[in-house]
């Protein structure tokens, strides 16, 4: 989107936020992540990046149905080192688009809060003076995608056009979420994992191939060493349902995000159970 000045951009952002019933900060964050994603799609690294995580889920179900502040990707064809990732993102920042936004890499660090896959966190700034928006991109490698990544058509927030980017298929997104919820059991402190499973299945469940999802879950659990959840999921769900801590976390999530206000914790657990019963033979 071409804007005359930062004030006009802020006006567009404010209007979109009102339309979607979400904060202007969230819309600005997603707009700048979109600007970065378009640069990736136009760079020599287009076929090395695979979009996943919250930003992809938001694109699938709608920004007003799932908010996110970061970009999650997996990379193929490169060894995951600080030096390689810094060069890749420095190159991406030089891609010129008529949107008046300039990007800079401000930091590279290891992702330490999860051991699912090795990862690097890239800190960037999106600058449209005086607007400056800090961004985070998480990059992993070795992700188990079943059967393979897909070409995803990503619609722009403001422009009536689309870009093409490689992404996780729906079944792999769901498989990773199911594995996370069940393997971490009551130790999982992220209500959004439950929400993501529920909303994806509610809105896109008919598009989900059950055999592919079963294979994706089996491969994901094998990779993560959590195969026991395939047979123990009913007992695990019983513990989850009875957890006061998880229920309190869910209620807090419902209060914070308007799009979750009509969904109970029991609803999300029922969705997990329904999916598992449908795919576990």
Model-predicted segments: where are they?
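Catalytic metal-binding/acid-base residues of hydrolase active sites
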Residues: 56
